[in-house]
Swiss-Prot record:
Organism of origin: Homo sapiens
Residue ranges of every copy of the DH domain listed in the record: 161-353
PROSITE patterns per the UniProt record, alphabetical: DH_2, PH_DOMAIN
BP GO terms, sorted: regulation of small GTPase mediated signal transduction
Disulfide bond positions: none
Transmembrane segment boundaries: none
Protein name as catalogued: Pleckstrin homology domain-containing family G member 6
Cellular component, GO, one term: cytosol
Gene name per UniProt: PLEKHG6
InterPro entries: DBL_dom_sf, DH_dom, PH-like_dom_sf, PH_domain, PLEKHG6
Length: 790
């Protein structure tokens, strides 16, 4: 911070500074004579920094009392006359003389502030502390609301009472802001100016006043954006104040008044710091007394000013309740109820933060009482060295499985005697926390207790009372619900035993409740995250079934299919005119069933696949879109199982082979689409197996089902699809039967609560979805899928 020199150390800037310089310059001529009186001939003279005080001596001894100077006076500066001799050289450097020198300098500075006003601070300090001229020009209000409403005499008594309540809200807001300005314009500005000349350097303005400037900015914004416009509207229209106009501002109360969280968290420490400084620092006490007697303070005490923000933030619900009580209109009552709820919700948040801060302080104090962690006796120095990194107990760490806002608390402590095994009884000191029980032994030479047993987690602890009225058994279990250790506890009295058992049971119940709440909250957040992801990109993300649906679906699937974790890869397509459906040459899975097929030739399977893709968009849609495709109603098969992950395939396919070689079947136009899509199912299974996603011998398979779109009639007749010698014709399972079972499976796997499809036409991709599909993305599905979803 820029130093603020005395009047004789160069020209000062500003009107007030020039007055101070002129005022101090009148006594420059007497500085040497004053120094001669204080320091006779041959006596060591103080350096210029220490001679600063002597320039003000004539002022202090002359007309100081006549000008209303404080009665605090400096000791006679001529001690040699009273003692009849010279003062020893050590007296000049004594702490008592330095204090007297600073006290007199403080007196002179404060008197200067009273006469000429507070000197201007640097611009950066004025901006930080909200100190400036003309900043409160808009914070004005009339004496009564009746001056703004000409027709107040014709208003009902109930409406007048409502206006009085609203007017109290406005006037108290301005009064409160002015009191906040006392702390910055008078106390903070005076302290900073004194520190610029080397006084009260040990006092921290940031610790004393906290974030009061942020509170001032918050209330100015609240007035300019919420309260001020309502008042201006009444001034312009002459109509009564409308509480509905305040609704938008009060609904965002938590965001606007967020600086109050920090202030309320530190208000106790701030007030304790102010009391300590006044009790131990006489110079600061004199400065505070001068501020409290200043005309701008309005006789406000420092501690009263520091507690004002806490009182104001808790007064808003009372003011709004007063307006609600006198508002007969239903619309106004609804708005006021919403405003009150928003304010009270923010106050609950502040109370929770304050309570959490107090709990953390209490935990830190309790942790200071816990000493070393010595639960083992190492046999050698080498073992002790290796154990040392793991012999630290941090009680301030968060509790496992519990929300972060909950802090570990010390619930009970006391001396007991414990017995483990056949050893004798040992005097110990127990600490019962929210989630753990510590067995410690007090140390005679230190105030800390040494941990002598591993921490006993409450969720694994069992307390059993014994026949002895003073004893109970502590059983600590492992993860397998087996005994890990057991302690026989002897309490001083039956009352102590009952208290230990009761507090332990209450702590276990509270811990179990907190863990259950955190588990439910995490599940809700996870479900919300999945829903948001599906809503953002429904065409590229797989659907996420509910927890119950996932469990039931997993039970009906085979182990082979439950291990499939497919990867969906969307590659970038640089050709704008390229078709959305890839050809067979870009897929290593298709065309491999016929080894003799050339790479560049078009097999019948290739033509069949393109026709199927054109006819049924379900083969190109994502899993979520497949579930929205309407299905043709078919009578249910009573002999078919209720839940099947895929239809059964012919025996030849189950053994890993392909369909037999045979003459091309003769089918009608109705069976053309179904038979062709049945072959696509087998092709999909074989393609997945070749890629390593499926086992070599799958037992079930899924497909996309029969298309609801009719055939165009333009397809050409195809030849034999699968050619392999050594197989006979298998006719029992027809393609339409397989597709019917696939439809039933897809219908049974619909997500509960999903909306029914409204249109049977295929969906069209938007430009944004197309751009997302063109980028290189790799999406790993975290749910096991069947072959139809691969």
């Amino acid at each position: 911070m820029k130093a603020f020199g005395p009047p004789h150390e160069g020209p000062l800037q500003g009107l007030v500074a020039s007055r101070i310089e002129t005022y101090g310059g009148r006594h420059r001529a007497s500085a040497q004579s004053t120094a001669g009186r204080l320091y006779p001939r041959g006596y060591p003279v103080l350096d210029p920094s220490r001679r600063r005080l002597q320039q003000y001596v004539p002022f202090a001894r002359g007309s100081g009392q006549a000008r209303g100077l404080s009665p605090m006076r400096l000791r006679d500066p001529e001690p040699e006359k009273r003692h009849g001799g010279h003062v020893g050289a050590g007296l000049l450097h004594s702490p008592k003389l330095k204090e007297l020198t600073k006290a007199h300098e403080l007196e002179v500075r404060l008197h200067t502030f009273s006469m000429f006003g507070m000197p201007r601070l640097p611009p950066e300090d004025r901006r930080h502390w909200e100190i400036g001229e003309g900043g409160d020009s808009g914070l004005t209000i009339e004496k009564s609301w009746r001056e703004l409403v000409p027709g107040h005499k014709e208003m009902s008594q109930e409406l007048c009472h409502q206006q009085e309540a609203l007017w109290e809200l406005l006037t108290t807001e301005l009064i409160y802001v002015r009191k906040l300005k006392i702390m910055t314009d008078l106390l903070a500005a005076g302290l900073l100016n004194l520190q610029r000349v080397g006084l009260l350097m040990e006092v921290s303005a940031e610790t004393l006043f906290g974030n009061v400037p942020s509170l001032i900015r918050t209330h100015r914004s609240f007035w300019d954006e919420v309260l001020g416009p309502t008042l201006e509207e009444t001034r312009a229209s002459g109509q009564p104040l409308d509480p509905i106009g305040l609704q938008s501002g009060f609904l965002t109360f938590g965001q606007r008044f967020h600086p109050y969280v920090q202030y309320c968290l530190r208000v106790k420490q701030t007030m304790a710091y102010a009391r300590e400084q006044q009790e131990t620092n006489p110079l600061f006490h004199a400065f505070v007394q001068w501020c409290e007697k200043h005309k701008r303070s309005g006789r406000q005490m420092l501690c009263d000013l520091l507690i004002k923000p806490h009182q104001r933030i808790t007064k808003y619900p009372l003011l709004l309740h007063a307006v609600l009580k006198r508002s007969p209109e239903a619309r106004a009552q609804e708005a006021l109820n919403a405003m009150i709820e928003a304010v009270e919700s923010f106050l609950r948040h502040i109370n929770g933060q304050v309570r959490q801060g107090e709990e953390q302080e209490s935990l830190a104090a309790a942790a200071q009482r816990i000493g070393p962690y010595e639960v083992l006796e190492p046999p050698s120095d080498e073992v002790e060295k290796n154990l040392r990194p793991f012999s630290t107990l941090d009680l301030t760490s968060p509790m496992l499985g519990v929300a972060s806002e909950h802090t570990r608390q010390l619930l009970l402590e006391g001396p007991v005697r414990v017995k483990e095994g056949r050893e004798g009884k040992l005097d110990v000191y127990l600490f019962l926390f929210s989630d753990v029980l510590l067995v410690t032994k007090p140390q005679r030479k230190a105030d800390k207790a040494k941990v002598i047993r591993p921490p006993l987690m409450l969720e694994k602890l069992v307390c059993q009372p014994l026949r002895d009225p003073n004893s109970f058994l502590l059983i600590h279990l492992t993860e397998f619900q087996c005994v890990s250790s057991a302690l026989l506890v002897h309490c001083p009295s039956p009352t102590d035993r009952a208290q230990w058992l009761e507090k332990t049971q209450q702590a276990q119940a509270a811990l179990q409740k907190l863990k259950a709440e955190e588990y439910v909250q995490q599940k809700r957040e996870l479900l919300t995250l999945y829903r948001d992801q599906d809503r953002e990109s429904p065409s590229t993300r797989p659907s996420t079934p509910s927890l119950e649906g996932s469990q039931s679906s997993a039970e009906g699937r085979t182990p082979e299919f439950s291990t499939i974790i497919p990867h969906l890869v969307v590659t970038e397509d640089t050709d704008e005119d390229a078709p959305l459906v890839p050809d067979d040459t870009s897929d290593s899975g298709y065309g491999t069933l016929i080894p003799g097929t050339p790479t560049g030739s078009r097999s019948p399977l290739s033509r069949l696949r393109q026709r199927a893709l054109r006819r049924d968009p379900r083969l190109t849609f994502s899993t979520l879109e497949l579930r929205d495709i309407p299905l043709r109603p078919h009578p249910p098969d009573p002999q078919a199982p209720q839940r099947r992950s895929a239809p059964e395939l012919p025996e030849g396919i189950l053994k890993g082979g392909s369909l037999p070689q045979e003459d091309p079947p003769t089918w009608s136009e109705e069976e053309d689409g179904a038979s062709e899509r049945g072959n696509v199912v087998v092709e999909t299974l074989h393609r997945a197996r070749l890629r390593g996603q499926l086992p070599s011998s799958p037992t079930h398979a899924d497909s996309a089902g029969e298309s609801p779109w009719e055939s165009s009639g333009e397809e050409e007749e195809e030849g034999p699809l699968f050619l392999k010698a050594g197989h006979t014709s298998l006719r029992p399972m027809r393609a339409e039967d397989m597709l019917r079972e696939i439809r039933e499976e897809l219908a049974s796997q619909r997500i509960e609560g999903a909306e029914e499809p409204r249109d049977s036409r295929p969906r069209k991709l938007t430009r944004a979805q197309l751009q997302r599909m063109r980028g290189p993305h790799i999406i790993q599905l975290d749910t096991p899928l069947s072959a139809s979803e691969v």
